[in-house]
Amino acid sequence: MNLRRFYPLDGFPRQRQLWSWISFDVANQSFTLIINTLLFSVFFSQVVVQNDAIDDRVWALTYGGSMLLTALLSPLAGAVADERSCKKRFLIASGLMCGVFTCGLGLIQPGQMWLAVLLYLPANFAFSIGENFLASFLPGLAKQDQVGRVSGFSWACAYAAALLLLILTAGAMMVLKLESAEAWRPFFVFAGLWFLAFTIPTALYLHEPQNERAVHPGGNLLTTGFVRLGKTLKDAGRYKDLAYLLGASLFYGTGMSVVVFFASKLAVEYGFEQVDLVIFVAVITLSGIVGTIIPTLYQDKLGHRRSVLIFLAVWLATALGFALYAYLYEAHAAGGSLVKYPTWPLWVIGNLLGFGLGSLGSANRAFVSYLAPPNREAEVFGIWGLMWKLSAIMTFPFAWVKDTMGNTQALLVLAGFLLVGLVLTLRINEKRGHAAAQQS
């Protein structure tokens, strides 16, 4: 039996190059999962802030502040990276910075809100801007009709790593009796060390071609960056389909950010214990692996636009279903019933959320790569990063509505963001956008 036929990248050249790139996707999972999704948001609320009336808003502002910094610097950093051929240096620096500051989160004591903010802000900034530089390598790793497969397989590997992290986390919680949020500091140190370890293959083997263009007059990095960025913005009218895609990313990226940063908090509010919470996130992760299979195997054949629309429709239906569950749960609680409201619908919702998270994230990255002009990849992915980071800042309206009006209304706001993203995606002409990129 030939097992190689089950390997999606079989026959691709530069296998070491591909795996060194995938390694950084795997590194990212420790921060995405342990810090942003599973543990740190709960630790921040229960141990650091210790005030239910403001914890959601403080968390959203802390996270949003780091995203605002990333959003402001992403396009400029991308322009500099393209001009000076320093994408790899920026990528590795971001990995080292994120790993070190993540380890520092293990030092936080109860009530030390400012220390938590001062450690989390640079860690999340480095993690977020590193995602942009990592994605900008994608067009050079595969042919244009293979980027969906590479992106999807890398996301599948990252989700498999996340599943391993979940098993290790759940095992440590049960064996070492670390169920209490105040006992989670060792997990933060572990997350930082994991990030640093998987950055090493990227540092050793990922190759970046050198540009031969002359540096713009003025010479320094800031001048270079602003000149290139200004030219890109001036040419934006030629790439209107890419502009639609980046705009859509802003809105459905908000939905993905809400899931990443509020899924564990919502699950706790609906009666999940800490071990249940780990299993719930494991279910989301497994569904995410399934979600990456479609972009890996079919996106290049099905079409990037059609793939994104399918995944968006699934997410929109899921958000509306979640809002209905929240409404029925609150009505049940208001009725004074002593019978616990069933949680099985949350497991269905979790599966659909995970499917959308894996499939939409991978499909979006590949779609941007398909529409990006050659030799401007880091600039385009810098602007892509700007949209995604702004989408994270847009989680604050969700948090405000959640705190002041309730979960049902907040989830309807989430569905509205996804609907706008779907409408913008419908305006994209995939073939026209790709042709415009190749003519640049």
Q: Which sequence ranges carry the predicted segments?
A:
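Helix-loop boundary and gating motifs at the non-cytosolic
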Residues: 6-67, 241-248, 252-280
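Hydrophobic core of transmembrane alpha-helices in multi-pass small-molecule transporters
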Residues: 101, 112-130, 333-359
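Juxtamembrane intracellular "pre-TM" segments in multi-pass secondary transporters
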Residues: 2-18, 208-246
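C-terminal ends and interior cores of transmembrane alpha-helices
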Residues: 95-111, 313-339
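Cytoplasmic membrane-interface "Motif A"-like loop-to-helix N-cap segments
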Residues: 81-95, 300-315
